[in-house]
């Protein structure tokens, strides 16, 4: 991601201007980073009803929330970060798609440390020229099936439909849970 952003800023004057306008409107710091928006969805070229469609793949795109709605509506500002063939993820990668996403997030936040060290970009700003842009994970946009695959969660069919929510339990188990150890609100 770091090298892609540096390449785009150095080779595209339009992208450099978008990043520069965003920086001038809302400069970021390690304490107030910009938010990455990650979008993922499965793409099925050809016959979607075919059972053994080996051409099916999962596409991962990323953008920056701070670009704002005026820019985010343009597909040119959603950058393809990964194209993962579904049959490869399923058969060769531990954890399937979740394992792939884990590798991406680890690369960005643990290896490249885009949240702590930032990404050095040449925006051509007078007197400073280079800026250090920091990022944190802001949103993950996906449909139900992609959500399930990205987070290795059961999604709507499970007892934990949202990663930030508490488990869903039946009314019959509430008295038992409250007497054991869980405070029920």
Where do the protein language model's features map onto the residues?
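Charged (Asp/Glu and Lys/Arg) segments that form or flank catalytic channels of large polymer-
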Residues: 1-38, 105, 114-185
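Residues in well-ordered beta-strands of folded domains
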Residues: 39, 61-65, 80-84, 136-140, ...
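Short acidic, Gly/Ser-rich segments with clustered Asp/Glu that frequently serve as metal-coordination loops
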Residues: 42-50
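E2/UBC-UEV (E2-variant) core
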Residues: 53-120, 171-185
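N-terminal leader/presequence-like segments
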Residues: 27, 45-46, 85
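A short catalytic or substrate-binding loop motif that flags glycine-/basic-rich loops and adjacent residues
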Residues: 29-30, 52-54
């Amino acid at each position: 991601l770091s090298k892609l952003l540096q390449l785009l800023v150095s080779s595209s004057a339009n992208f450099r201007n978008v990043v520069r306008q965003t920086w001038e409107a809302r400069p970021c710091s390690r304490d107030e980073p910009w938010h990455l928006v990650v979008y993922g969805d499965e793409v099925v070229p050809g016959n979607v009803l075919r059972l053994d469609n080996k051409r099916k793949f999962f596409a991962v795109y990323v953008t920056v929330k701070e670009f704002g709605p005026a820019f985010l509506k343009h597909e040119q500002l959603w950058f393809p970060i990964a194209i993962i063939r579904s049959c490869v993820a399923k058969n060769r990668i531990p954890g399937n798609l979740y394992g792939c996403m884990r590798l991406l997030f680890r690369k960005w936040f643990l290896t490249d440390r885009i949240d702590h060290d930032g990404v050095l970009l040449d925006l051509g700003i007078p007197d400073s020229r280079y800026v250090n842009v920091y990022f944190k994970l802001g949103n993950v946009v996906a449909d139900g099936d992609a959500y399930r695959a990205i987070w290795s969660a059961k999604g709507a069919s499970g007892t934990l439909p949202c990663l930030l929510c508490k488990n869903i339990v039946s009314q019959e188990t509430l008295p038992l849970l409250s007497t054991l150890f869980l405070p029920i609100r």
